């Protein structure tokens, strides 16, 4: 039997179903209107927020490379040059360009005391002929020294020293043969024992004359005047700043391995003539005080002790030349002694040539370091006795 689908017939059951459907449509429509009203009348657009597709990324830390710092080269600064006085080692403002002045100093007992020798950078003592002993004072700048002397005549050995240091030699005349010898050596010098009406470069000490000094012991040089007079005479007073004077200095020249030498005694001895000099160390002064003729020397103008930072004794081959005047072999050199700060060592010395410079060395050949300050230099014949401290050591 075949079944047959038939549409439901109208009746009560069918009407109820239709009513339910109609009500559902109305409800849905009402809800839709309410939603429209909420969104804005007449505006059917709906703002839809789409889900964000962005995502949080952890902050990226880039590897930071420190900027490459090129090594900076500081501009090279040349050290400021240090200029020193060639005869005393003291610091000066600029290159040394002055010519040294040397003055012949009377050293006979009757002529004492000296005047102005404490202001010399170097004071030398030596036999000059037979038994006559004199001094030679060297000044890098004599202009501040009001009086120097007393002044006596020049000698051959003074001309030798003048050539070693290229000095302007100041003297009170001299033997004709000695003056001729100086000229042959190329020494520039002049005699201050001449008519100087205005006392520009020299004067006679009237007080000495009244005190009974001999006329030959009363002549003095004026430091500023001798430079002025040299200029007036056309004598060169400047110097090559690169000139080598041969001397080396340090702030403390006390010999490290030296023997104690609270006093140093030298007996100048040549051809039967003798003269004693003793240098006595004064710890308070830090200098050796000059003693001769049984007494300590003082400056006749200031009353200050005549004292020196350095004591140098040069034992030289000596000979007679030109009527008994002495000459030393500076180029051959020899041995000697150096005392400073209360100690003493043996040394060697020689000049490079007759034009210098004069050099001092230790026994092992190192340059001798003098203490900054003034120096006493004795030039004595080989064989002149030297003793120090208790006299237990002697050089013959």
Feature names for model-found ranges:
Residues 1-60:
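Gram-positive cell-envelope targeting signals
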Residues 3-8, 46-51, 55, 78-120, ...:
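A surface/extracellular/periplasmic glyco- and lipid-processing/surface-interacting theme
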């Amino acid at each position: 039997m075949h079944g047959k689908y038939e549409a439901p017939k109208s009746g009560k059951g069918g009407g109820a179903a239709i009513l339910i459907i109609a009500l559902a449509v109305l409800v849905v429509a009402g809800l839709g209107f309410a939603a429209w009203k909420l969104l804005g009348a007449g505006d059917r657009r709906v703002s839809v927020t789409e889900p964000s597709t962005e995502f949080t990324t952890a902050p990226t830390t880039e590897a930071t490379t420190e900027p490459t710092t090129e090594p900076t080269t500081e501009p090279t600064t040349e050290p400021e040059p240090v200029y020193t006085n060639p005869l005393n080692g003291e610091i000066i403002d600029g290159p040394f360009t002055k010519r040294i002045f040397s003055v012949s100093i009377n050293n006979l007992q009757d002529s004492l005391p000296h005047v102005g020798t404490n202001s010399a950078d170097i004071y030398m003592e030596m036999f000059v002929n037979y038994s006559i002993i004199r001094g030679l004072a060297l000044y890098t700048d004599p202009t501040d020294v009001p009086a120097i002397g007393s002044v006596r005549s020049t000698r051959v050995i003074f001309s030798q020293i003048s050539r070693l240091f290229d000095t302007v030699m100041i003297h009170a005349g001299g033997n004709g043969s000695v003056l001729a010898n100086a000229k042959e050596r190329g020494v520039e010098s002049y005699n201050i024992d001449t008519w100087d009406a205005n006392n520009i470069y020299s004067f006679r000490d009237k007080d000495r004359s009244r005190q009974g000094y001999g006329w030959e012991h009363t002549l003095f040089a004026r430091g500023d005047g001798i430079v002025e007079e040299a200029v007036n005479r056309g004598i060169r007073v400047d110097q090559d700043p690169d000139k080598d004077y041969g001397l080396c200095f340090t702030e403390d020249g006390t010999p490290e391995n030296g023997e104690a030498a609270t006093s140093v005694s030298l007996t100048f001895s040549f051809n039967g003539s003798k003269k004693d000099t003793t240098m006595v160390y004064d710890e308070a002064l830090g200098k050796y005080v000059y003693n001769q003729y049984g007494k300590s020397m003082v400056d006749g103008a200031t009353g200050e002790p005549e004292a020196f930072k350095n004591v140098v004794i040069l034992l030289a081959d000596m000979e007679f030349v030109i009527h008994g005047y002495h000459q030393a072999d500076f180029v051959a050199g020899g041995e000697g002694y150096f005392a400073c700060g209360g100690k003493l060592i043996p040394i060697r010395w020689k000049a490079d040539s007759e034009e210098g410079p004069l050099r001092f060395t230790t026994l092992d050949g190192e340059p001798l370091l003098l203490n900054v300050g003034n120096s006493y230099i004795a030039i004595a014949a080989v064989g002149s006795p030297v003793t120090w401290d208790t006299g237990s050591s002697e050089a013959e």
